[in-house]
Amino acid sequence: MGYMCDFCGEQRSMVYCRSDAACLCLSCDRSVHSANALSKRHSRTLVCERCNAQPATVRCVEERVSLCQNCDWSGHNNSNNNNSSSSSTSPQQHKRQTISCYSGCPSSSELASIWSFCLDLAGQSICEQELGMMNIDDDGPTDKKTCNEDKKDVLVGSSSIPETSSVPQGKSSSAKDVGMCEDDFYGNLGMDEVDMALENYEELFGTAFNPSEELFGHGGIDSLFHKHQTAPEGGNSVQPAGSNDSFMSSKTEPIICFASKPAHSNISFSGVTGESSAGDFQECGASSSIQLSGEPPWYPPTLQDNNACSHSVTRNNAVMRYKEKKKARKFDKRVRYASRKARADVRRRVKGRFVKAGEAYDYDPLTPTRSY
């Protein structure tokens, strides 16, 4: 183990991990011991500033160095030690502090609270200077709060719609309350920062927005299902109210076309009869258009529905017949084979079992029993 970090080999080693027996810099210490829960339990402390190979146990206040047990003993208990501080006190009388160990991934502020000598910036040792200059991604609650406030300042109220904008200012303030980011996000999408609530529809498009009239006309939804009326002789057939004249604006997507006659579309409600020509259809400027015509979507039951209903009725009738037969059953005691029973009644037995002819027996049904 040397002066540099055992993991990256670029930064100066600052802490010593007893479980891994490695000297690490603060950055590598955080990245290595934040991998899983087991590594977070490793106990670490400062590395000795004399040998750079053992964990430091004490801190010499006079010399401002962290020492391991061996370096502390050799430096303060050896009478011939020439590395004493500038003060008049002997090395044996130097004030020493015990260095605490830590585990997990503490922030720089938490490390400063564990090692209080890190707060004394005057005359710092190399170890303390490295600790002060090291930049760690702190996870403390104060840093999180500051970070969240900074992000909030970027998102909220940074680029609301100015009052001098060409977009009319309506009664809606939802877009202003939410706020938008001052970046090229909307520019990349080709979108303008306008109020998406469509409450300023009249000022934006110069016309009133009435969804029911735009979609269905003045007749409402019933106008979709009007069939052709009989036209006078010599005249053309009259189309219902929901004809090709009542279409939505081509700027709104997806475009829904309501036609009075079956057209070339993916969804079509058939049932309207009459002559049709290529001129009766109007193409819509959209890739996916839905055209509704003629009959409403609620149809009378089909043949398949009738078959399912009849099958259910047949099954219910069969169950009823089965229950009636079950009630009429008789559970009387019957003799299945009368001839076998007649022969068994006259055979001789021994302890209730049949015996062959000529063998000893203790019961003969043909012999009259005596009553003593």
From Swiss-Prot:
CDD domains: Bbox1_BBX-like. One of its GO terms (biological process) is circadian rhythm. Zn(2+) 2 binds at C48, C51, C71, H76. The keyword Metal-binding applies. It is found in: Nucleus. Zn(2+) 1 binds at C5, C8, C28, H33. GO terms for molecular function: DNA-binding transcription factor activity; transcription cis-regulatory region binding; zinc ion binding. Keywords: Metal-binding, Nucleus, Repeat, Zinc, Zinc-finger. A zinc finger (B box-type) spans 5-47, 48-99. Its main location: nucleus. The keyword Ribosomal protein does not apply. Residues 315-357 form the CCT domain. GO terms for cellular component: nucleus. It holds the Pfam family ANCHR-like_BBOX. It comes from the Eukaryota. Belongs to the CONSTANS family. This is Zinc finger protein CONSTANS-LIKE 9. It comes from Arabidopsis thaliana (Mouse-ear cress).
